[in-house]
């Protein structure tokens, strides 16, 4: 989700659509042990954190973009997608938003995964 968002937002001449499932939208919201290993401390590399954040590039969205997240995600917290939703609304961008209640990062259980795959497959088939 992180990479598909950044590709779509930063290279709209190349990418016409992307699906984002549980994206990291700001590395400040992610696991600091993992993030700081590669990016250093936010206090020391604030510009790097901002430059790598899809939130900093929403103005570039010109394609189709469904944003999907499980509200019980304990890996990439749903806060990431909530901030993305707000940034896209404030940038007056069209997008689709879908939340899976109480589902974790893997988005599974019952018919959940099949629903997700069917939704993504239909979106891709309609927009390629």
Sequence positions of predicted segments:
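Active-site-proximal cap/loop segments of hydrolase catalytic domains
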Residues: 1-128
């Amino acid at each position: 989700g992180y990479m598909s968002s950044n590709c779509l937002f930063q290279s709209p001449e190349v990418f016409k659509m992307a699906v984002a499932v549980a994206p990291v939208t700001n590395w400040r919201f992610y696991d600091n042990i993992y993030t700081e290993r590669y990016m250093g401390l936010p206090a020391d590399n604030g510009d790097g954190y901002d430059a790598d954040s899809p939130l900093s590039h929403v103005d570039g969205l010109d394609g189709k973009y469904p944003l999907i997240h499980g509200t019980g995600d304990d890996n990439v917290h749903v806060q990431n997608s909530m901030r993305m939703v707000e940034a896209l609304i404030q940038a007056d961008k069209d997008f689709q938003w879908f939340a899976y209640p109480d589902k974790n990062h893997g988005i599974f259980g019952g018919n959940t995964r099949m629903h997700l795959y069917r939704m993504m497959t239909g979106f891709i088939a309609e927009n390629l």
